[in-house]
């Protein structure tokens, strides 16, 4: 049986932090159920991803955004209540990017995904 591609829509720009930088996200990403999706959130060059928590939210039509997780480092991260462990965060310092990885995609994962940054207390 062929799977219908699962389309993960991403907001192309969203703002966060005190100075309201523009965070860049690709306009969309698609994958099939059971596969993994890697969603990115690229910070402007004058802001170092290493100094910020990256927050991720999921929004489905007609519903408010749902907090998924935040990621600062492997030892400083947090999962939202009821959010499955197949949602995980990371960073790519060389690309100045925050990453949301969704493994074992399910049809219910079809949604808009938003990133937000906030300065870390650890920095």
Curated annotation (Swiss-Prot):
Region (Framework-3): 78-115
Residues covered by region (Complementarity-determining-1): 45-53
Domain Ig-like: 21-123
Complementarity-determining-2: region residues: 71-77
Residues of the signal peptide: 1-19
Record field: transmembrane: none
GO CC annotations, alphabetized: extracellular region; immunoglobulin complex; plasma membrane
InterPro entries, sorted: Ig-like_dom, Ig-like_dom_sf, Ig-like_fold, Ig_sub, Ig_V-set, IgV_Light_Chain
UniProt-annotated stretches for the region Framework-2: 54-70
Recorded coiled-coil stretches: none
Coarse class of the protein's main subcellular location: secreted
Superkingdom to which the source organism belongs: Eukaryota
Residue ranges, annotated region (Framework-1): 20-44
GO biological process terms held by the UniProt record: adaptive immune response; immune response
Region (Complementarity-determining-3): 116-123
Keywords: Adaptive immunity, Cell membrane, Disulfide bond, Immunity, Immunoglobulin, Immunoglobulin domain, Membrane, Secreted, Signal
Keyword Cytoplasm: no
Subcellular location(s) of the protein: Secreted; Cell membrane
PANTHER family from the UniProt entry: IMMUNOGLOBULIN LIGHT CHAIN
Subunit-level organization: Immunoglobulins are composed of two identical heavy chains and two identical light chains; disulfide-linked.
Biological function: V region of the variable domain of immunoglobulin light chains that participates in the antigen recognition. Immunoglobulins, also known as antibodies, are membrane-bound or secreted glycoproteins produced by B lymphocytes. In the recognition phase of humoral immunity, the membrane-bound immunoglobulins serve as receptors which, upon binding of a specific antigen, trigger the clonal expansion and differentiation of B lymphocytes into immunoglobulins-secreting plasma cells.
Designated name of the protein: Immunoglobulin lambda variable 5-37
Organism name: Homo sapiens
Name of the gene this protein is made from: IGLV5-37
């Amino acid at each position: 049986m062929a799977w219908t591609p699962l389309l993960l829509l991403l907001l192309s720009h969203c703002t966060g932090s005190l100075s309201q930088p523009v965070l860049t996200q690709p306009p969309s990403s698609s994958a099939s159920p059971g596969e993994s999706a890697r969603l990115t959130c690229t910070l402007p060059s004058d802001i170092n991803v290493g100094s910020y928590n990256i927050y991720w939210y999921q929004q489905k039509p007609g519903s408010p955004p749902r907090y998924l997780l935040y990621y600062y480092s492997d030892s400083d991260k947090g999962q939202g209540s009821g959010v499955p462990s197949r949602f995980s965060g990371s960073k790519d310092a060389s690309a100045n990017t925050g990453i949301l990885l969704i493994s074992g995609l399910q049809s219910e994962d079809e949604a808009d995904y938003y990133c937000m940054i906030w300065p870390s207390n650890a920095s």
